């Protein structure tokens, strides 16, 4: 028997003979398969928790795969998540839904001090959860303390510019292309839910609801009584760009726009409840931004064409949107801790949009004052997540598909099995299974 071949187990009475459908599997393959199953189970559990939150807390929301008008995003270093329901009139004729990547500036209401937090554990998939009696969250952070409350008034927007996103994409091995600015709700009624997901996407995980007595507060946005920074109404967006203000529908660029927070007319921009901008903050506050990964199975058939960067996001069909955790750390390494070539993933026959890794080296970003854009319409948006379309590398399809299977297990999708790799295919020889020597 040649070195490296697998010995058959028919010479002993204690070990059964391999059946006609059994193939020999190396210990490394067994270990990789076990790791993939464990990772898939953890991801599936976290997604089920997010699905329960969407179904239980959003009024009128059916199964999230049938009517997805709510998005769950992770914002800031400590993981403040915002669940927002967009009014039906904000959707276009093609039923496109806003896919947004919030940079810590969503519509929100400051939470009350000393509220009781209900935590839903992600490991046992319990809907009830354990009540935590703790003064978990203070009142909205003052702007003199930037970064204390990601997603609130203490998060600056300076430093989020084209250079930041360029460094971000370069660190992720991508080529930056213009990002489209998604459309959010026009001036009107917006239902929001502010939750804290410090460990929701990590084992054991948890979800904290604030405040418990008012899950979805009604926020009425009108241009005449909802100032932003003291001089911008709800019909105005706050755009950040390297050279000039961003105007949706006219050009593309690395920008971020905001939805105004409720406030009384004439309030100072640094007062609680007003979405202010702390211009004295450093760009380090944006060292980790929001990560959003969505899956759309109905947009395109066949393998998606490979390209090495971000593009304008196509409209996402409302009943195709799914919510996932940040998966970059899981998919960028192969089964043997080897980095996948070009960070490519086997798409499994469907498009798999992947948000970029937002842990940018923003310390090197050029600082400039944000500019308020006077938009012609009342459409206000946030930075949309780009789409990364990949196809399997020709040299190692199975290795790339393994990372895709890990994600597919979490989504419970019907991704086909990977094609057998020439390096690890098995053949039948005689009465036993013999593994071919890697070439």
From Swiss-Prot:
Disordered: annotated span: 1-36, 126-157, 411-439
UniProt protein name: Uncharacterized protein in transposon Tn4556
Keyword set, alphabetical order: Transposable element
